[in-house]
Each structure stands twice: as structure tokens, then as C-alpha cells.
Amino acid sequence: MRPVATGIFKALVFIFSSLCAWYSGYLLAELIPDVPLSSTLYNIRSIGERPVLKAPAPKRQKCDHWSPCPPDTYAYRLLSGGGRDKYAKICFEDEVLIGEKTGNVARGINIAVVNYETGKVIATKYFDMYEGDNSGPMAKFIQSTPSKSLLFMVTHDDGSSKLKAQAKDAIEALGSKEIKNMKFRSSWVFVAAKGFELPSEIEREKINHSDQSRNRYAGWPAEIQIEGCIPKGLR
């Protein structure tokens, strides 16, 4: 190819390339929104700064259950005391019946009585089982509760040293399997029904004895708890 022809060919290629580049730029300008360059740069930088979406916190359930109780049931949670500073607690339908904040928990056996048909609290009381003669009064208190009552019992500190046969028999009559196995500072929780039967699948009782080789606290076993949902309308 002659030098003149070669030069003309290169010039044509250059002009064609320039036209293609110009047209591509024109199309790109038409497609991109009219946004200031500073905003574009800010948006690019902020991509890495945007917060990561998090799952919403789970909704709090009655008595701090992990999952809600079905309709037409009562939610309950019993927690024994643990050590000197972790107080026993009885929660029913998201109301703390006995606990540190309510100021009605003490050493011994703590009892809350609820009217099963209305869900209203009838009485709360504690009985010191380390000092004093409180076993007889506790037995009478339990025996005097009306029919169609729910009884919730939890220990704080020691619930056995002054516990006598009459009180043990009264609690055993409500269905307890562990009351006669209580030892010094045993952690114990118990739910009972008077005048009707609870479903067999409901967890009613748990006990944890003091054992120096495995106690969580110095001289005390770990606290224990049970929770559940009691159906309404039982006979």
C-alpha cells in the first residue's frame, strides 16, 4: 500500500473511532441521571457504611417464657432461691406474686394461692423453716385454701430444718413426690391444684439437693425453675 493511501486509511480509522467514542459518551450521558458528581461519590462511599438490617428482637412473653402460652391458658413460672442474693420468685400471668421487688419473699417455703376460675390472687405467705415453729401454721394455711385453687410453692435458703410431718402430709396430699425428700437447703419448686386435676403433661415439681462437690454457690445448690401453661376450664 502506498504511503498516501496508508495515511488516508489511518485518518479515516481515527475519525471513525472518535465518532464512536463521542456517540457512546452521548448515550451514557443520556442514561445517567443528572446528579452532581459529589452526590455520586458520596453514594458510592456510603454503600459500605449503611447499617446491616437486623432481625427484630423477639417479643417478650408472659413471665419471660420463650414462647407464648396458647389462648385460654394461664402462664406461670416458679424459681427457687439460689445462694444469699438470688431470691425465689413466683410469676403468674405476668404478675410477680412473690419476689424481691414485691418485698414478700423470705427464708423458708414461700406460697402463693390463686383462684383458678378467676385467675385472681387469694393469698401470698412465707414460712420460715429454719427458726421458729412455723410448720403447723403452714399446714393449716395449706389445708384452709379453698377448692378450685392453684398453689405455687418455692423455697428460699432452707425449707426443711423445721418442716414437720403434718406439713409434709398436707403438701404430699396435693401431689408432691419430693416433699419428704427435702434436705437442708434443698432447692424446691412445686405447683398444685386443689379440687381439680392438672393435665399430666404439666411439669409440677423439681428438686435440687445441696452437695458440696457440685453446689453452684458456697453452701447452696443452684436455683431451679419450672414454667408452663395451665389450661382454663379444667374440672
UniProtKB/Swiss-Prot annotation:
O-glycosylated. Coiled coil: none annotated. GO terms for cellular component: extracellular region; extracellular space; nuclear envelope lumen. It holds the Pfam family ILEI. One of its GO terms (molecular function) is cytokine activity. Residues 1-29 form the signal peptide. Belongs to the FAM3 family. It is unclear whether the N-terminus residue of the mature protein is Glu-30 or Ser-46. This is Protein FAM3B. It comes from Mus musculus (Mouse).
